[in-house]
């Protein structure tokens, strides 16, 4: 199975982090995640996260420093996840692909079930 690069946004505002609940009809449905998506050919990871957040949340973001990377593999996917700190620069969040969302503090992460990979990166925040 080919490894896929995925870029995810750690969107921050007022010491809170934006998380979104995956669509129940998709792989890992019902779990929370830091939104993002697959890297297209000839696209940088920063371009990937900007495009994916615009498509999924209808907002424009500034991509800051990279937080870290994680790997996740199961019977359906093999991904190399790249996480970037981001801030919203324009627009209001509209959920196009996710079922729910929340702005949470570090202490509140434990109240949500995260997708594999994403739950491992939380310790770096």
Where are these regions (language model features)?
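Conserved Nudix-box catalytic region and its N-terminal flanking loop in Nudix hydrolases
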Residues: 16-55
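Short secondary-structure junctions
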Residues: 56-63
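Conserved hydrophobic "DFG−1" position in protein kinase catalytic cores
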Residues: 11-12, 19, 86-88, 103
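NUDIX/MutT-family hydrolases
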Residues: 85, 94-124
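Active-site-adjacent beta-strand/loop module that shapes the phosphate/pyrophosphate-binding cleft
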Residues: 60, 69-92, 100-102
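Conserved N-terminal beta-strand and adjoining loop/helix that marks the start
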Residues: 1-17, 38
